Amino acid sequence: MCIRDSYSHYQTLTVDSAAEEARWNEMMEAYKDEFPELKAKWETYHYPLQAINTYNDDSYWEFEDKPQATRNLSGVMINRLKDILPNLIGGAADLAPSTKTYMKGEGDFSSTNRAGRNLHFGVRELAMAAIANGIALHGGLRPYVSTFFVFSDYVKPMARLSALMKLPVTYVFTHDSIGVGEDGPTHEPIEQLAMLRAMPNFNVFRPADATETAAAWYYAATATSAPTALVLSRQNLPQLKGASRLTLRGGYILQDSEKEVPDAILIATGSEVQLAVAAKAALAEEGIDVRVVSMPSMDVFDRQVKEYQEKVLPNAVRKRVAIEALSGFGWGKYVGLDGKVVAMPGFGASAPANLLFEKFGFTVDNV
């Protein structure tokens, strides 16, 4: 009897709810006809892919051709996107000057300024991410949060809920490796990147230059059912020849071999892509012709069709080296039993960044 009564009750609710939805849709159509400008804003707020018609707009992808930290480039992108997405809102855990996440001219959100788009979360990373989840659950707004990458440990429980609830929250993590330098091992992330990559429905990008950073932000800003993390450098990185919007496919051929079948493949992310490029040039002098693959997002690359994956990483090439100045965990699936991984063997140390990269084997000769 209880089951039958419950079924009857919910059948009634279904009919009533359908009628309520129809009334709501009718009201919305009338609203759109009466207020076309507000209708356009509504569409922008709720359908970001329609708003961001920038993929073929060259100005979106233009940057100064000089070495820049990807955290700085991310800051440039945030201030470009704020004009395209008026519902973009976000901030940092008391680190906005360092994470470069402040939207210029948009004011600070407060009890007296609800229109402010910069949120000051304070030094409370977990609460920051929880607040962003709430904003995303409400709908209409596009939240982003930021802190140093090593502090992603504090963010992780709420980031996991972002993934579980399919919320398009953007996580901006800077100071992404031993490139942090003198701050030492307490502030040099090692295992954090592998941790985030292991999370289901969570897209992680570690871009190498301006083009890849712009592509990562494009991906994050148009996401609808998954969070995205941007893992960014403190130190300046060169703009790379061959960097491509193919970043949106997770991994791509940055610089190819002249041979149909390369002698070997070098795979890298972020600040180590420049090292792979330099190693390719050095190997060429020895008559070894290699391909350089940039892999800004394992998660996205793993979802590509097999034909594309085979084109980038052909099975016929067994000699592969992955290079990343963090934990090497997870690279085995790309390099295989015949490959090598140049990664951090343990915690970092306190010294200038260039000395640390040399100490831990991130050199052309070692690669």
Region spans (language model):
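Thiamine diphosphate
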Residues: 4-5, 12-366, ...
